[in-house]
Every structure is written in structure tokens, then in C-alpha cells.
Amino acid sequence: MRTITTICLVRHGQTDWNALGKLQGQTDIPLNELGRIQARQCGEFLSKEASWDVIISSPLKRARETADIISHYIEVPVIEKMEFIEKNFGVAEGMTAAERASAFIDKEYPGQENQESLRSRLMNGLQDIQREYPEKKVILVAHGAVIHFILRLMSNESIVSNEMRLFNACLSTIRFEVDSWIIDDFNQVNHLS
């Protein structure tokens, strides 16, 4: 069986809003100093781990900055793809978990992107990667909800649940073999000190 495409999913480093527990969504918040350190640790680890062909990034600052820092270590181009922008959480963006729980008991946030829209754009993005980078090793820098959704889809929710939290700068690896995606590992943070 031959591996067609391998993707290392990297969640962006920490931002001030992450530190405060605020939901970011598509609000364009940059990395903080710890986030830049985490991105450097990702870059150092990934440079020793394998030979990479390309980095694909969400266009949001926190992901793009993480991707640019990683690129410094592995010297491959960074390509932005809108398909991997974070989920739009509507009016809940900027709110803490406590504020959201108080304001939206049912967790339905007015103006948020629906699951079908998110699934559709993420699957389109993954199919583009598969088509454009066959038999390549790809780093995809994205966001918590995006990576979580991809992992849930790939595992049929068998190993990744709704409640699982992805850490900033965590690494998860998926590969496409023959006609299906396989999760090799997820939410790894051993590279962070």
C-alpha cells in the first residue's frame, strides 16, 4: 500500500485571546510571545522529523505567522488557502467560555458558520491538497475548530470527540492511502517545552 499524501496538521501558537480563554473564530488576532516560541519549537521539531514539500496556511495572522516561523526552519514555501480559515463563530467571537455559557445556553451562536458549510470547505481544501500535492509531505497550519473537525471526520468520531481540546501548537498527522484518510497521531505536544 502506498501513501499518497501525508499532512501534518499544526494548530497555531498561542495568542493573547487564547491565554484569556476568548473564542477567536475569524477575528484576526496575532501570536503572543509564547505563541512565537511555540512556533519555533514546532519548526525545530518538524525540521528533524521529515523532509517537507510545502506549508499550507490559513490566512489569519496567528496561523500565517506560525507557518512563516516554521518555514524559516524547513525552507519551503508557505501558501495561503482560504478553505482552512477558522470557523466563524458569529457574535460569540471575543467572548470567554463563561460569557458564552451565560449568553447562549444551547451553544447556538447567532451568525456562526453551520457544520455543513464548514465540512464542505474543509473537504474541498483537503481534496485540493490531495490533487495538487500527490505523494508529498504537507504541513497545514490552521486552527482548533478546523483541525478538530478534520480529525472528527477522519476518525468517524471514534477517537476524537466533541469534548476533546486541541492544544496550541499541537501536531496531528493524517495520510491518504488508496482511497481513505488515516490518522497516525493527534494532539501531540512532546516537542513543546
Predicted features by range, described:
Residues I7, K136-G144:
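Generic beta-sheet signal
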Residues T15, V146-I147:
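Short active-site segment of divalent metal-dependent hydrolases/proteases
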